[in-house]
Amino acid sequence: MSLVDLGKRLLEAARKGQDDEVRTLMANGAPFTTDWLGTSPLHLAAQYGHYSTAEVLLRAGVSRDARTKVDRTPLHMAAADGHVHIVELLVRSGADVNAKDMLQMTALHWATEHHHRDVVELLIKYGADVYAFSKFDKSAFDIAMEKNNTEILVMLQEAMQNQVNTNHERANPVANPVTVTAPFIFTSGEVINLASFVSSANTKATSAHLEEMEEGNSLDSSTQQVVGSGGQRVITIVTDGVPLGNIQTSLPAGGIGQPFIVTMQDGQQVLTVPAGQVAEETIIEDEEEEEEKLPLVKRPRMAEMTNRVEEMKEGSERELLQQQLQEANRRAQEYRHQLLKKEQEAEQYRLRLEAMAQQQTNGVEVDVTVVEEVAEVDAVVVTEGDEVERATQVMKSGRTTEPHTNVSIETISS
């Protein structure tokens, strides 16, 4: 059996998890080949969850960080399919936990994408970078937010608090950020209205009491609250330009029984407040959001100015089109005059040619010479009737014909 066939059989055995077949093929010299996508036997074993097969291949020396044509490693495969035991095997064998594929996604990204909580927990345990950003400028936390997976959100938030951020800038940083550094704290409760935080000094909650809070200024716009499910209290703050510096509290003596996730509608980040800790929230706003907060008086003026600019642009475009049309008409007239002039010149030249041909026909005689070829004959016998006829023809034509000197003519009378 050729090496190519041995390599193909090794790939198939790894795909099916046939440990004995894998050992036999490697003992017979089967090479560690890949298929047309660059998938190695270890990739297939990790993808299909064959723990013992992956262990055999790793002991045989297969590369633990082998790359496919899209730069995916066996760890990417195992994490995406939720094979936590193979993920642990690969990481313990020295696989790069932060390896990125062609989309700049790590194994943590893929595990979060497919809701594999155990894999996410294991990767964080082995030091996966929770601040890594993909090609689409998303971290694992952003993906968990999109998937609305609160368990993974809390897990990643705790890891972000315990891990130093070495990736300080995203791929596309937000221009002109606005930072609010005033600290604010929330405690547990079934339904929490933020307006009550600043309207009075004493606030009561349904499931846990709140300590006294300093009275702040009243909010300029309405606030909303949302209570999450699954054992987590989720508070959504709709700021609409509310100065968050007015909200100031202190932790109660009992602390917070469970983590909170506070999402800012006008911001980008999500805050989780664990028990016994004080956290600050940084809000980043875009320039478009700043424009939305302009006074209502300025908005019509800006709309009028925008309309005027658009009308001016349309008018200039129309003038340009009219100028181009006039120029095209002028050129067409020039071409038409030139064509008429050429036609007149051609007609004059034709008339001259006809006149010249007529003159040549009237003033020149055409001489036509008829050459008679007479075959060489020794003697010609002419009867009297022929001679009379010949004489008659000569009289009619008015011409005389000399007899040939070399031909003897004899007249025979009958």
Swiss-Prot record:
High levels in thymus, spleen, kidney and intestine. GO terms for biological process: positive regulation of transcription by RNA polymerase II. Transmembrane segments: none annotated. The modification Phosphoserine is found at S218. Keywords: ANK repeat, Coiled coil, Nucleus, Phosphoprotein, Repeat, Transcription, Transcription regulation. The keyword Kinase does not apply. Its main location: nucleus. This is GA-binding protein subunit beta-2.
